[in-house]
């Protein structure tokens, strides 16, 4: 079945249904009129405006016919179950209660509306174009039940559930109702907006495409069983209720905002679905408050939920782009899940929030974002890529055991955010990766942390049962502490881990457990009962000097665990008591090991400065090692000592000192720079069977020949020199192998004393003296493993068994070498005999094959084989003759290195390997005297001088051969039999050199591929090519003649001969002196390869025929062609069965086409008729590749004909290219035979090429592409191919259709289509943008035209089928017929720009033209548009213009004919319009600029959109029925869109029954409204120019953007006036039920607005208030809140912060002074105790840096804040007497304050300079004291306050108001205390005091905003506080240090703390803005802890203080350093 458009098919069905309905209706009418049916039509038609259902028979209704028209018979209003039709543009009132209307037909009218005055049911509503507005009266309902209607019964047909005619619906009151249901049921779709305060009830699947409640929110939207799809951007209803278990609510708009709550009112939880499918969806109220929903589904986009209650079984994020944001504190009851792809979806909490269920259970979310506030997560599963704490006040608490899959991060300021675990918990990801958290708190239970990064100021274990386990390698940045009871808490590391801070600083932990991995501990204090290494891989590193209090033990398997010390360190307990450690590592410094037990596999010295000393005779169990830089570290033994393990195994120690006595080293490895024998009695014995001593052994006594070295092991080794300073007495090698690595060996004798004795020199060595065998003959082994020299003989007394030469060169200077075998054992082994030598024995390679070098430097003899076991790498023969007598010679290469080099093989021999000349070229002689085999190449590097093959000798060459001469003796044979490679592939072998005596020689080719390169190959008498072998004769060096007294035998059917010119510098020739005979029928292969430059195959005698194969007998099976090959006509190829032209070949032959089969691969085969006409069989030509080319060519100077005997047909479509090349201009190539190019299968391309002519009559072309690469003219008939131009000069005349595309291909050719010639494919211009001309000489159908320079049409009707973006330089009319343009034809180009006739244009369905359409000289004809059509430049026409759809003109429009605007069309003009006439019935005209409209115009139901533009009208115009004017009234300009009727013109509106004026008011500034703020819509220059409609027919709608401005309209003059209504709007907003009635601080906000409203015009206050008019009420309230001042100012915050700073820093200093004063007084009564050496110091200076923060939560609607303070205090004080101290201090503090809640965005920065005087008086010899502090604070405050402004209607932005002012404060504090001395050195000090403060704020004015800069007056106020508390402290003496920890608590009661109101106002306000105030808490609590360490004159302290009040928390940490002098 043919493809049918779905739309076409639908239209056909509709037309069929209409025809059937018409037939049925007609029959029914006929039967009815005849009385056959006996029924009347149940429908009526309204005939007058204001008709009502209750009308009796009168003038408002007529009976209706089945055809849908009035029959003239008056009727009653529609009855129950009737239908009715609008007969005009009427208002109809449904005023009969409970009436059921089957259907309503709007028909072709523009109805004013349907008023529902009584409960009414309406079935379907259909229309002919316009929509029916409906208004439902308060308390009444409209039910849509979806009934259908049929023409026979109702006068029109309407399908069920069809409301395409229903427009906007207005609900007239709170209980006006719209009910949507369907009897079917089926889906009902409503297109219009629904407004009003009523109720919508949906009982079926329904879609509401418009907005709901946009102007006036609905009371309720009820969703019953079904899917309610709300597609509008605005849905406003108090509650949207899901009333049925099957209820589904879907919001689809990209920016949907549902204002109100969504609830499940079924009474059953967990039913009902909410789908939020838009990119930005918003629900402002609670969800599921009454009963939980089943699902909230968030699609691709962000859902913003503003309710405090969200209840649903699951809130699902279903898409990668899903996100949900809770904008307020919320309780989410249920789970939040990602049901899309893993690691997508974002959940954001912006206040204190709770989620009761799991998060990300199905798939992990991308992000959980926690803003300012605490997120309490109760689920057992939390899965998200990252849980982010984004604010200083962010906190997350997991209230149950939980698995948190993903990371937890602080993305706000560093060291903020709290994470609390209250049960067994797991976190899989990092914590604090971006910025560190403040605290990780672990309660009772185990916290399992899996991240690699844990960053928090402190990780606190707060309970006896607290435990934290790090399951992966981790870096813990911060401290780990036990803040519970001492010796509790467990920390477990299970991977490589780092802790940067102390562990157990507050209280010791029970256990630090180090599992598999390294624990790097950076603290100076590590306190734990036991530090346990529990795993084989456990390790702990102390990175700083440390005191480890407690034991270190290995509780795992023995000999595991590592302990590392990196400074002077002390361990108080045992090490390895339970099980030995693997390693004790000692870094830079001295390790003092205090335990009674030291057990470790290895004690490692890791640093240059490492040292360990064993002071007594010791047995060290384990090894001692240096793992630092080599040759560092000292171990000292001072008596008889034993070490059971190795010493210096990793790196050598610097020194091992052996004193008097025997040092028995049992380890296999001893490494030290020097092992020193320091005493005459020193003896060093290595007992290990495999002892290796790395380093030197020296005698440092100063006396030669003392000291003994015994190498008693089976394998002993010394790597360094022996006896370098003073010689040893003896080196004795017993039964075993001694390996000596030194370069100096000094001993009288190195003796091999045993049959099993062996000595190995492992490094280059000079052995001065002999090496001898003093035992039995043929025993003893000497091994050299580096470059070595032996100056004497080897084996002189008795022959050695073996001399082994390892890696390196052994130089033997002696003339006698006796050894059973000299073994070359290594790849780098080499032996050089430096003098003539007789080697008695064999030379062998016992290492890897093809390694080892033997060099002879004079006449030499070897009696045995060489390389018998494995081939050597090289036998090198220098100047002289090497006589080799062995039958086996194996070496990779035997090299002749000198001009005088020669080698003679004296016996038949197998030479395994190559023979090569590595000296000068053409030197060296090789002689074979018997049948010989050489497995490798001969002469590979350089050609040899001569290769002699003796008489009768057969030389088998296993490789290539290259010699200057190859001399054959009589009856000699050279056979090449080289193997394949390891993969079974042929290796190309070569045969190079001049052949002497070749006439007697035989060449056997028994290798797969052999190439001969010398022209003398033609002299060899016989060449035999073996089975499966290929022999090549290459002419690269010059021309070659073959077959001259020469036999070439193909010994098998698969033997092959190659004739080639692979590397020749030009085209070379291979000439045949005779026929080349095939071995049999279809046997043998011949290959021609032209190589780089080409090969000619011809006869050695010109004109003498030579045959390749026998035409009538034995033919060669295959001829293969490679590269460029030309066969001369002398050589006949008919003796070839198959010709294969391979890839990239260029084969030319005029004889090959008679071969059996010709197969063309990706190559070219040229048949040239240059010598005459040709008859080509053609059927034997095969295209084996899609790009195979066949060239039929005439390159002669004559006309030629090529006659085809058969079709040229590829095997598959789109394969093969045929090029027809007529080379010579004026000459012709004729293709005869009447055959087809591309028969059953089409060719890929047919190319016409050349400068000559073509004759193709009778020839058919079946191809994909026809390419025109010609310079002349060509005429083609019908073709299915694509046609492509390749030359600018192409001139193609197409006489038949083109079935493919036509491509100008960036060429400026011309293609002419004859009449009725069509192009089925695209006309395009690949690679170009403005090339080529297409001329259509008559009618034509074109598919798509794009990219060409010119299209000429018009001689006949032309249709272009496809549109889209089209570039045509110009379309020109060649006649006045029609050019039909397809849908969406978007032309970049012009029409009739440079010429052309009046071509008619028909835009079928939209499009555009970028250039001019016609000019004054070259106008176009008729213009018809439909769809969206636009013209970017001027339009000039002289026909009839019919404009439909949406048509826009960006430039002038001129038409000398009539213009008709189609019904429902929209036409937009941007510049002047000129026409004869306009008809605009039911059409819209938009004016985009002020312009002149010059034309008569008539219209009915016309809409004119003026905007703010003036239309100057010239002509005669009249409008009837409805006229709609859309205008814009610009308040700033005090003008708007209007029509000015020019003098002499008229505009008649008297026939307009409804003048609808729609005004959009913009830029209305209340400051500029005056009596002249008005404008007139239509005016005339002369009287009578305007004929108005009666004023009662004028209806005005005003769209206003400023809530504080309203308008009035004078219908008689069409004039609009503006007025200020702000006062009333404010009252309504705050009245009961108003949007701002119940907001926080409502009274203050209202008062603020009233003050601003009362300000004078032009003032800042009035300007800001005007801007608020663009906001919604809630936005307005927020903006006002940001202006109003809270009672708590930055100065109040600073006062609190500064009081805490002073109290903490100075008071702590006074505490220390009090302690010193007590000692001074005590010292006056008795002696000074230890640690009190500073008693004479009377003065002190101190410094105390500090950091702190404070948080105030929101209180009584007053915004909270967060402050951060840093700074420092310096002070100086002194004793005035023993009882009185006075001091002064200076404090600098910098504080950042960030406000929250209503003031979010406000920030303050404060610089404080505080100057203090302080004093302490202690009653002599009593415990009573009094302290006093007086302070002055100078504060510079910079504030940045957010101001809210309206940027557009109901859209806000922000500006920043900047303030800069000073605040001063004066504070005095007096405190008294009494110290009680308690047991155990504990002091208890009760304290009581008073504090008084005065604060003075300076006045200032803000800058930075447009109208919202406040002027703030200064204020003064006082505070008075009482203080009561206690302090506990104790002095602890630790050596010379006195530690004083203290804890204090204080109650602060404010007797006076009331803060005065703030006077802040905008310019123009007569009174200040109200101040938001609350009653501040009276009571707060101060708690602090600190510790002071005193050492002599220095004191060091650290303190932590907190201040806690109602919703207030502040904390400060400080350190202090004090020096007393």
UniProtKB/Swiss-Prot annotation:
UniProt keyword annotations, A-Z: Cell outer membrane, Glycoprotein, Membrane, Periplasm, Repeat, Secreted, Signal, Transmembrane, Transmembrane beta strand
UniProt source species: Rickettsia conorii (strain ATCC VR-613 / Malish 7)
GO cellular component: cell outer membrane; cell surface; extracellular region; periplasmic space
Function text: Elicits protective immunity.
Key word Aminoacyl-tRNA synthetase present: no
Changes after translation: Glycosylated.
Reported impact of residue 1308 to H: In strain: Moroccan
Keyword Transcription regulation: no
Stated family: Belongs to the rickettsiae OmpA/OmpB family.
Domain Autotransporter: 1734-2021
Segment forming the signal sequence: 1-38
Impact reported for residue 76 to H: In strain: Indian tick typhus
NCBIfam families assigned to the protein according to its UniProt record, in alphabetical order: autotrans_barl
Name of the protein described by the UniProt record: Outer membrane protein A
Source taxon at top rank: Bacteria
Pfam families named in the record: Autotransporter
